[in-house]
Amino acid sequence: MKIVLILEYDGRGYCGWQKQPDRISVQSRLESALSRIASSQIQVVAAGRTDAGVHALCQVVHFETHVIRPLTAWVRGANALLPDDISVLWASEVNDDFHARFSATERTYLYYLLSRPARPGIFQGKTGWTHYSLDLEKMQTAARFLIGEHDFSAFRSAECQAKNAIRKLVRLDISQSEQFFVFEFCANAFLHHMVRNILGALIYIGQGKYPPEWIQILLGKRDRTLAAPTFSPDGLYLAGVRYDARWNLPTFNVIRPENVINMIASFKYSQNWAGLR
């Protein structure tokens, strides 16, 4: 049988999702826990192979097993064996032709960026940071040039193993709440470091180093060396994976960090002002 899981994790303590020799990965931790429950070796496949330091709010994985266990064992049992920074949220049996990676039609990533002179304390490792002020309107204008199907060679890493750089970016929304910026990227698939490389360029534009039209130049040149440096992984989250309705997977409502950020920020500001009266 084939089982599908949805999990969330804090990526700070790992070399990334994928197993690597002599390094700790999210995949290796999950496979170890599931193998103990099944009393046999389990290998998992993920929808997205997140990099070191990148988090997931809704990672989808599948695995095959001949062992019969209640679905609760794959959730509660796994969570009892996993470290605190990885949590299985949901499990279900799925048809044998389902594939967590290749059946996915769309992936969504969120990036949370703090823009202020002082580095983050409470949100250290959970949000990116720049000490520069950013122009939201300029970044939004630049983002519109990226929507659609393009050759994203200027925004792929040198280590990217994809056969070509053609990707379709469906949505790139940028919003601001106080000192926090939220970037939402949605595409059929992403190249290695694509989100963080685009983010680096948008931040340069927000700082005023380049005009929004610079994005068009980068797309046309297809040269990674002309673009901005790869930005920090700290604020990047795999937030959702979409599948065709025939797989009968649920629409999973994740806890969006900006809601938590806004709640904490609102409480902090109200307490500070109350103390000054």
Curated annotation (Swiss-Prot):
GO terms for biological process: tRNA pseudouridine synthesis. The active site is at D51 (nucleophile). Coiled coil: none annotated. Pfam families: PseudoU_synth_1 (PF01416). GO terms for molecular function: RNA binding; tRNA pseudouridine(38-40) synthase activity. Keywords: Isomerase, tRNA processing. Its EC number is 5.4.99.12. Substrate binds at Y109. It catalyses: uridine(38/39/40) in tRNA = pseudouridine(38/39/40) in tRNA. Signal peptide: none annotated. PANTHER family: PSEUDOURIDYLATE SYNTHASE, TRNA PSEUDOURIDINE SYNTHASE-LIKE 1. Formation of pseudouridine at positions 38, 39 and 40 in the anticodon stem and loop of transfer RNAs. Homodimer. Belongs to the tRNA pseudouridine synthase TruA family. This is tRNA pseudouridine synthase A.
